Amino acid sequence: MTDQKLAKAKVIFVLGGPGSGKGTQCEKLVQKFHFNHLSSGDLLRAEVQSGSPKGKELKAMMERGELVPLEVVLALLKEAMINWLTKIVISLSIRYPRELDQGIKFEKEVCPCLCVINFDVSEEVMRKRLLKRAETSNRVDDNEETIVKRFRTFNELTKPVIEHYKQQNKVITIDASGTVDAIFDKVNHELQKFGVK
């Protein structure tokens, strides 16, 4: 059963392979539509930074390129959403779910999603972007070995999520190989079809 505190939330799932530009485009969604942006990855990294026992366990999993258990991610997302709703927030952009069970459970226990934005770009482009980002980021998962694992995880687990939501006519697939602004123009145009203005 969905959480009544979140019944009016407008949630957009944002998907795409590692390095597809999800974070950059979510920043633009925040600026244009005044969405709040929740990234399961950012929430997990914040937990790691806290130095808590759970954070240390999560750090080891992330360094190995493993997926964090669904219950942990869902609890972090739900807590963050409820905290933001106290600030009268009704729109969220979430870089989630990575696998089908996560999406189904999120919609059952938290709230339904309005639509899913899927950023589509070749692995070669994503790899180049990630290695470039690694030059300045402190992310433990921006290295060649982990990048390969992340691509495999995306292909095996996240693509079925996209297919599931396509059957519900909720997927917006965006070619994410262009410039940041050109990509966002496409996002903006497609979101209007779902009433986001």
Swiss-Prot record:
It is an enzyme of class 2 (transferase). It is found in: Cytoplasm. The keyword Transferase applies. Its main location: cytoplasm. ATP binds at residues 19-24, 133, 178. Residues 39-68 are annotated as: NMP. Signal peptide: none annotated. Gene3D superfamilies: P-loop containing nucleotide triphosphate hydrolases (3.40.50.300). One of its GO terms (cellular component) is cytoplasm. InterPro entries: Adenylat/UMP-CMP_kin (IPR000850), P-loop_NTPase (IPR027417). AMP binds at residues 40, 45, 66-68, 95-98, 102, 139, 150. The keyword ATP-binding applies. Keywords: ATP-binding, Cytoplasm, Kinase, Nucleotide-binding, Transferase. Residues 132-142 are annotated as: LID. It catalyses: AMP + ATP = 2 ADP. It holds the Pfam family ADK. Its EC number is 2.7.4.3. One of its GO terms (molecular function) is ATP binding. Belongs to the adenylate kinase family. Monomer. Catalyzes the reversible transfer of the terminal phosphate group between ATP and AMP. Plays an important role in cellular energy homeostasis and in adenine nucleotide metabolism. This is Adenylate kinase. It comes from Schistosoma mansoni (Blood fluke). The lineage of its organism: Eukaryota, Metazoa, Spiralia, Lophotrochozoa, Platyhelminthes.
